[in-house]
Amino acid sequence: MQLSLGPVLYNWAPERWRDFYFRIADEAPVDVVSVGEIVCSKRSPFFADHIPAVVERLQSAGKEVLLGSLILVSLRRERRQTEELASAEGALVEVNDLTCLRTLAGRAHAIGPFVNIYNEASAAFHDAHGARRICLPPELPLASL
């Protein structure tokens, strides 16, 4: 079993955001870390300059890094942002909105907690289309696993 840390959902100052992930890299006993702005596309530019350093630091510490997509993609610029994310090299994309799947076109990726996977058929569908990791919804009863 691996311990995963989801992305920061809060609107922190960019330096605080960066320093948080640096501490995770140096101190936290987690295996997988999801980074990126998933809540609001308007906040993305504030963190963009820090993402390469954060990814490098986490990977150097032996963490697997997932690049999180937006939870809700509705604007043209958000679709472009999703396409840019899908073309990124060096880390799996964590899909949090199904519009991201089109741009991944069968490439390896992760399914984040904001995509509802409640049954085996859904999991099999995503597996067949490149999902290598699926984060199940927290409300899913243990008996259903």
Positions of predicted regions on the chain:
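Active-site mouth loops of central-metabolism enzymes
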Residues: 1-19, 44-45, 70-74, 108-117
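Conserved beta-strand positions in the central sheet of alpha/beta enzyme cores
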Residues: 4, 32-34, 66, 94, ...
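Active-site-adjacent beta->alpha loops and helix N-cap segments on the catalytic face
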Residues: 14-15, 41-54, 76-78, 95-107, ...
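Conserved, mostly hydrophobic/aromatic
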Residues: 24-25, 97, 126
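Glycine-rich, proline-tolerant flexible connector loops at the mouths of alpha/beta enzymes
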Residues: 26, 31-53, 57, 69-76
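Glycine-enriched alpha-helix->loop->beta-strand junction motifs that scaffold or abut catalytic
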Residues: 28-31, 87-91, 105-111, 125-133
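Short beta->alpha connector loops at strand-helix junctions that form conserved
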Residues: 36, 113, 136-138
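Glycine-rich phosphate-binding "P-loop"
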Residues: 59-73, 81-83, 108-110
